Swiss-Prot record:
Keywords for the protein's UniProt record, in alphabetical order: Membrane, Photosynthesis, Photosystem II, Thylakoid, Transmembrane, Transmembrane helix
InterPro entries for the chain: PSII_Ycf12_core-subunit
SUBUNIT field: PSII is composed of 1 copy each of membrane proteins PsbA, PsbB, PsbC, PsbD, PsbE, PsbF, PsbH, PsbI, PsbJ, PsbK, PsbL, PsbM, PsbT, PsbX, PsbY, PsbZ, Psb30/Ycf12, peripheral proteins PsbO, CyanoQ (PsbQ), PsbU, PsbV and a large number of cofactors. It forms dimeric complexes.
Name recorded for this polypeptide: Photosystem II reaction center protein Psb30
GO annotation, cellular component aspect: photosystem II; plasma membrane-derived thylakoid membrane
Function noted in UniProt: A core subunit of photosystem II (PSII), probably helps stabilize the reaction center.
Membrane topology per record: Single-pass membrane protein
GO terms (BP aspect): photosynthesis
Lineage per the UniProt record: Bacteria, Bacillati, Cyanobacteriota, Cyanophyceae, Nostocales
Coiled coil: none
Major location category of this protein: membrane
Length: 47
């Protein structure tokens, strides 16, 4: 029982969270560009 719990904890602690957050930040920035273009087109250039 405790081996399974410790394996689960080790799986989460071995994940490199910094890389995940950096990739998430880049993804949000990349997605934000087309969203702004779509809003500009939808509102006829009036933000």
């Amino acid at each position: 029982m405790f081996d399974a719990v410790s394996d689960l904890v080790n799986a989460f602690t071995s994940i490199n969270w910094e890389v995940i957050f950096q990739l998430l930040s880049v993804a949000l920035i990349v997605i934000a560009g087309p969203v702004v273009i779509f809003l500009l087109a939808f509102r006829n250039g009036n933000l």
